[in-house]
């Protein structure tokens, strides 16, 4: 199945790169994790039945082939960016899927356009509540910008059995991310919008995937996230945090099964 690459200019003037793969009736809007890009989803996408799904994967601002800017690093702006990509890709409705830091951003999307979000999938996601991240960690990780080998070390810290080829692909793309973006996205996790999502009605169908051995955002964190979404389901996989380089096929299978339960 061929990839179609495109870009869109947001209403604040930032060019975002994205790609679509597949021509199925269900749109999956895919948001990558820290340092990643649309390519972070390649192994996941290869595991999907693309007669049933259409993957729309974007490079978050400051990452991949998107503009390297120093503005717009807020949860609302990132959600609006994702909607701009969905518009450009003609994905009127979609299931939003976010990995790691983007597990937080996909939680913001229903606050802006609940009628467009058919379901939410949070994969080892960051919570909508404020996290505690030492400034030294933020500084150290951001300082790795442009250094492929040092960036490759980060997912290894939190993975149990990563695929070396997928790690290499991650590192190639992570080297494109700007230093500002690498730091700013981490600082976004220090804020909270949890009160805005608690008790929202109607509830949007939600699936949460957790790595049993995730030392960063493990099962307890994922269960706390799920508690904000009545009727949500938590599935634990035998891996660490880095599901997209450890268990992409299994993650794709669970997402496909979840989407199969949604109204058509």
Task: Show where each model-derived region lies.
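Short beta-strand/loop motif that positions the catalytic acidic residue
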Residues: 202, 208-210
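Catalytic histidine-centered segment of alpha/beta-hydrolase-like enzymes
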Residues: 239-252
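Gly/Ala-rich beta-loop-alpha elbow adjacent to hydrolase catalytic centers
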Residues: 98, 102, 106
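Conserved HGGG/HGGXW glycine-rich cap/lid loop of the alpha/beta-hydrolase fold
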Residues: 14-68
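Conserved acidic catalytic loop of the alpha/beta-hydrolase fold
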Residues: 77-94
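Conserved alpha/beta-hydrolase catalytic His-Asp/Glu region
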Residues: 131-132, 147-200
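Flexible "cap/lid" loop of the alpha/beta hydrolase fold
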Residues: 107-112, 118-147
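Acidic catalytic loop of the alpha/beta-hydrolase fold
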Residues: 212-217
């Amino acid at each position: 199945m061929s990839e179609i690459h495109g870009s869109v200019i947001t209403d604040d003037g930032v060019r975002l790169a994205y790609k679509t793969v597949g021509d199925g009736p269900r749109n999956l809007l895919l948001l990558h994790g820290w340092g990643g890009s649309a390519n972070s989803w390649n192994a996941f996408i290869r595991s999907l039945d693309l007669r049933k799904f259409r993957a729309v994967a974007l490079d978050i601002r400051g990452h991949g082939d998107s503009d390297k800017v120093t503005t717009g690093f807020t949860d609302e702006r990132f959600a609006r960016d994702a909607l701009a990509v969905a518009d450009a890709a003609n994905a009127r409705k979609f299931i939003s899927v976010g990995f790691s830091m983007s597990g937080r951003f996909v939680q913001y999307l229903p606050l802006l356009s609940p009628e467009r979000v058919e379901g939410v999938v949070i994969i080892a996601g960051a919570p909508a509540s404020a996290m505690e991240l030492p400034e030294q960690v933020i500084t150290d990780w951001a300082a790795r910008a442009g250094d492929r080998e040092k960036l490759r070390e980060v997912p290894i810290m939190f993975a149990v059995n990563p695929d070396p080829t997928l790690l290499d692909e991650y590192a190639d793309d992570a080297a494109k991310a700007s230093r500002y973006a690498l730091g700013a996205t981490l600082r976004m996790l220090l804020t909270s919008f949890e009160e805005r999502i608690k008790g929202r009605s109607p509830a949007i169908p939600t699936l949460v995937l957790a790595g049993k051995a995730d030392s960063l955002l493990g099962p307890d964190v994922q269960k706390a996230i799920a508690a904000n979404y009545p009727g949500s389901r938590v599935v634990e996989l035998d891996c660490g945090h880095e599901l997209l380089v450890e268990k992409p096929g299994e993650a794709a299978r669970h997402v496909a099964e979840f989407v199969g339960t949604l109204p058509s």
